[in-house]
């Protein structure tokens, strides 16, 4: 279910403060975060976030197309190993 329009988008305050602090400086460092629930704002464009996926931090470079999505959408939590191989050829 989507968030109510009257509430507006959500992003953690500590994340906004870190982006504002880096916007003033020329050198942009990777912002490490555990906040997968935060919505990507237009201010975040051009910044790199290290989003935690449960075991490591995945680097996510924010582009214009990502605005409005959540940070967690770009750091998958599950690794797909592939389906079992079909052994019909080797049985003959």
Curated annotation (Swiss-Prot):
Region of interest called Disordered, as start-end residue ranges on this chain: 1-27
A Pfam family this chain is assigned to: Ribosomal_S19
Residue stretches of biased makeup (Basic and acidic residues): 9-27
PROSITE patterns per record: RIBOSOMAL_S19
Iron-sulfur as UniProt keyword: no
GO molecular-function terms, A-Z: rRNA binding; structural constituent of ribosome
Gene Ontology cellular component terms for the protein in this record: cytoplasm; small ribosomal subunit
Swiss-Prot/TrEMBL keywords: Ribonucleoprotein, Ribosomal protein, RNA-binding, rRNA-binding
Single GO BP term: translation
Domain of life: Bacteria
Keyword Heme part of the UniProt annotation: no
UniProt-listed InterPro entries: Ribosomal_uS19, Ribosomal_uS19_bac-type, Ribosomal_uS19_CS, Ribosomal_uS19_SF
Family according to the record: Belongs to the universal ribosomal protein uS19 family.
Function summary: Protein S19 forms a complex with S13 that binds strongly to the 16S ribosomal RNA.
Protein name: Small ribosomal subunit protein uS19
Species this protein is from: Staphylococcus saprophyticus subsp. saprophyticus (strain ATCC 15305 / DSM 20229 / NCIMB 8711 / NCTC 7292 / S-41)
Gene: rpsS
């Amino acid at each position: 279910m989507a968030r109510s329009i009257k509430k507006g988008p959500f992003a953690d305050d500590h994340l906004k403060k870190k982006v504002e602090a880096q916007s003033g400086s020329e050198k942009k460092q990777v912002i490490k975060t555990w906040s997968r629930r935060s919505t990507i704002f237009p201010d975040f464009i051009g910044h790199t976030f290290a989003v935690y996926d449960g075991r490591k931090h995945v680097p996510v470079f924010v582009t214009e197309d990502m605005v409005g999505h959540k940070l967690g959408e770009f750091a998958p939590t599950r690794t797909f190993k592939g389906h079992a191989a079909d052994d019909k050829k080797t049985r003959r």
